[in-house]
Amino acid sequence: MTTDVEKPPQRNGNHIKHKLIPSKLVSPPSGPQGPYRLPKNQHFRDHRRFGFSNIMLVLVILFLFAPLFVVITYSFNAAKGMRWTGLSLEWYKKLFFDSNELWRAFGNSIMIAFSSALVATMLGSLAAIGIKWYRFKARAYIQIASFLPMVLPEVIIGISMLIFFSAIKVQLGMFTIFAAHTTFNIPFVFLLVSARLDEFDFSIIEAARDLGATERQALFKVVIPSIMPGIVTSMLMSVTMSLEDFVITFFVSGPGSTTLPLYVYSMIRYGVSPVINSLSLVLILGIMILALTLRRFLKTIAASS
């Protein structure tokens, strides 16, 4: 049922006319000067800005994903060069049945990437928690020093690692690559976990201690579950950085420790085989599956917390 509101009387000569208007059609003023109205050209400016943003977004996506699209497309090319001659699965057959050295290098990369990422994640996370938890004089200096490997050129880090391992007489090989990758991954883990800890309310730890929890119990039952998304993200980034590293690995590698980047680089003198394009597609699919699995894992953690 609608109620009618009387409109102010309108004078027409000597008579006053009254007109009833439904209250649903009466818009109350939104301010002291009545309802706000956009300028006439405001909608045009917003539409133009929206269109420009879309164009820039498309250009950025093309810049990022066009090389991947080219690599995936030419992995199905029958010819070895850039000239397209037709679809073929020849390079995938060679990848899975005639590329023993490539798979050996790929296995070395996977083993070093996950092992170094695991150790770097544990050390970097504990370091970030310790820096945020305890107060001491050298705290600021340690934070600054932890960022140095991130800003130093990889060539300098690689040469420093080589000199260090030579000084302590450690034979170059898988262990030296593992140690080097762990070293340069720790600062990235420290940075990501520290950013997550900045959002953490440490009064929860005090409440847990008041309820009788020890420091170790508060760490494993309160702190770590709360920052687990940051820990998992830092580990994934460490794996990615270890897989693609070439410069530092080049300095600290030895006989029998060829990784995938080193193997691809050694092929340049003879020409890179299209088998690498096929391997790229396999890696992309593997990383996508890993990312989706971690995304589901992080959602489960967020829902449980």
Regions from the PLM with identified roles:
Residues 70-79, 189, 231-265:
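Non-cytoplasmic
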Residues 4, 8-11, 15-22, 28-37, ...:
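C-terminal transmembrane helix and the adjacent membrane-cytosol boundary/short C-terminal tail
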Residues 36-43, 81-82, 89, 138-139, ...:
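Membrane-interfacial helix termini and adjacent extracytoplasmic/periplasmic loops
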Residues 41-46, 114-146, 163, 219, ...:
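Transmembrane-helix boundary motif in ABC transporter permease subunits
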Residues 55-56, 61-68, 190-194, 200-202, ...:
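Transmembrane alpha-helices
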Residues 66-100, 250-255, 305:
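Short membrane-interfacial helix/loop motifs at transmembrane-helix boundaries
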Residues 43-49, 92-101, 242-295:
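Interhelical loop and adjacent transmembrane-helix boundary motif
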Residues 101-108, 163-186, 230, 235, ...:
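Loop-to-helix entry region at the N-terminal start of transmembrane alpha-helices
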